[in-house]
From Swiss-Prot:
GO MF terms held by the record: interleukin-9 binding; interleukin-9 receptor activity
The protein's name: Interleukin-9 receptor
Extracellular topology ranges: 41-270
Motif Box 1 motif boundaries: 301-309
Species, as recorded: Homo sapiens
Membrane topology (Cytoplasmic): 292-521
Localization per Swiss-Prot or TrEMBL: Cell membrane; Secreted
Domain Fibronectin type-III: 149-259
Record's keyword annotation contains Cell cycle: no
Notes on the domains: The WSXWS motif appears to be necessary for proper protein folding and thereby efficient intracellular transport and cell-surface receptor binding.
Length: 521
């Protein structure tokens, strides 16, 4: 009896264990079959075949909208989505599907922030049992943003433009700089597909439409939508928002303003003035720089302009700035005025007093006067003081390099010789004093020579040694002179400056003068 009882109890315990194992395996098979029939995946990262059919978007405030693209379940099923916060334990929000959509409204204390993170699961009942599927283990609301469309869109027509204004939710006002808008406007009778668009409107709640953008005389419509602006690349990931455009706002109608005629200033368009000024500067600028900075161009254009530097050079290099001495050294010959032409013999003296002496000096070899040449022909025609031409003209006038003109008043004249030189002819020949009476031409000749002589000229008593002298010979012939035609006059003068004496002597007018004068300076 004892042995049979033990065997019976062993079979009973084994049967109970087997039944428990069979029940566990049967329950597992039922769950697997149910999940396969419903098509819901329970894979950990939301990679199941049906998890991607859910799309949940947030308005970034307190609302989350979800859409399910799977076929609807039977009438007896009531699916829902459960949002479980990964940061606040126990924080769950249920979104019941109505057809293929559902909306969950969060409580005011659970307003969405960029750091929010949720786990989404799908729940439904099957044969009296609740079935659970994992949709998204880490749902970030800031990555799925679809804002509400702008509200209260209004228009304000003014002269030449139209101003559009709109409003946003007060909860989004702190994020105004992160909002980007797009405007669409068209004529009222046109379709929205033909509307004009203006985008990249960031951080503002108003916009201006110019009159030239609209068709005058037509009624236009405008509407607006918004999305989160694309931030720079240097923004941290926790503050970056992504999403899609909101729905279009309600359109607003307005009358297009009239276009105003272009205001043209009296001088024309500003662009034309700018072009004219630019061309003027391009033409005058290089020319100014060319003349201002190029000495070679200056020399080319101004090479024919005479310079008085050579004329005044002896004033400082020879006479040490003494203007009176310099003027005396640059004496000039006799120059009769036009009133003396054809003057009778009795009225000749006033004209002679107007005469001036022209002093000339050659650069290398002096020109010999007629009086000096006659000195070489005869012994009776030598200069006063028994000076020969060698004593008067030793080396020529080399002190001055150019011929100069000056006018010297004739005050005093002194007769020194009765020999009158002959007038110069065109062939360079010289005639004797005896043929002067047959010459019908009036003439006046003056020669100037610089040199050294040992004795002073008449009237010069300031120096007994060798002094520099400038001899001037002047002879004039006039038809109908007095009988003393052979008498000549010598101009003797003396100029003195520190370290240097200059004497003037020469042959002057014949004895038509009523008196003899000597002029010393």
């Amino acid at each position: 009896m004892g042995l049979g009882r033990c065997i019976w109890e062993g079979w009973t315990l084994e049967s109970e264990a087997l039944r428990r194992d069979m029940g566990t395996w049967l329950l597992a098979c039922i769950c697997i079959c149910t999940c396969v029939c419903l098509g819901v995946s329970v894979t950990g990262e939301g990679q199941g075949p049906r998890s991607r059919t859910f799309t949940c978007l947030t308005n970034n405030i307190l609302r989350i909208d979800c859409h399910w693209s799977a076929p609807e379940l039977g009438q007896g099923s009531s699916p829902w989505l459960l949002f479980t916060s990964n940061q606040a334990p126990g924080g769950t929000h249920k979104c019941i599907l109505r057809g293929s959509e559902c909306t969950v409204v969060l409580p005011p204390e659970a307003v969405l922030v960029p750091s929010d993170n949720f786990t989404i699961t799908f729940h439904h009942c099957m044969s009296g049992r609740e079935q659970v599927s994992l949709v998204d283990p880490e749902y970030l609301p800031r990555r799925h943003v679809k804002l509400d469309p702008p509200s209260d869109l209004q228009s304000n027509i003014s002269s030449g433009h139209c101003i559009l204004t709109w409003s946003i939710s007060p909860a989004l006002e702190p994020m105004t700089t992160l909002l980007s808008y797009e405007l669409a406007f068209k004529k009222q009778e046109e379709a929205w597909e033909q509307a004009q668009h203006r985008d990249h409107i960031v951080g503002v709640t108003w916009l201006i439409l110019e009159a030239f953008e609209l068709d005058p005389g037509f009624i236009h419509e405008a509407r607006l939508r918004v999305q989160m602006a694309t931030l720079e690349d240097d923004v941290v990931e926790e503050e970056r928002y992504t999403g899609q455009w909101s729905e279009w706002s309600q359109p607003v109608c307005f009358q297009a303003p009239q276009r105003q005629g272009p205001l043209i200033p009296p001088w024309g368009w500003p662009g034309n003035t700018l072009v004219a000024v630019s061309i003027f500067l391009l033409l005058t600028g290089p020319t100014y720089l060319l003349f201002k900075l190029s000495p070679r161009v200056k020399r080319i254009f101004y090479q024919n302009v005479p310079s008085p530097a050579m004329f005044f050079q002896p004033l400082y290099s020879v006479h040490n700035g003494n203007f009176q001495t310099w003027m005396g050294a640059h004496g000039a010959g006799v120059l009769l005025s036009q009133d003396c032409a054809g003057t009778p013999q009795g009225a000749l003296e006033p004209c002679v007093q107007e005469a001036t002496a022209l002093l000339t000096c050659g650069p290398a070899r002096p020109w010999k006067s007629v009086a000096l040449e006659e000195e070489q022909e005869g012994p009776g025609t030598r200069l006063p003081g028994n000076l020969s031409s060698e004593d008067v003209l030793p080396a020529g006038c080399t002190e001055w390099r150019v011929q100069t003109l000056a006018y010297l008043p004739q005050e005093d004249w002194a007769p020194t010789s009765l020999t009158r030189p002959a007038p110069p002819d065109s062939e360079g020949s010289r005639s004797s004093s005896s043929s002067s009476s047959s010459n019908n031409n009036n003439y006046c000749a003056l020669g100037c020579y610089g040199g050294w002589h040992l004795s002073a000229l008449p009237g010069n008593t300031q120096s007994s040694g060798p002094i520099p002298a400038l001899a001037c010979g002047l002879s004039c012939d006039h038809q109908g002179l007095e009988t003393q035609q052979g008498v000549a006059w010598v101009l003797a003068g003396h100029c003195q400056r520190p370290g240097l004496h200059e004497d003037l002597q020469g042959m002057l007018l014949p004895s038509v003068l009523s008196k003899a004068r000597s002029w010393t300076f």
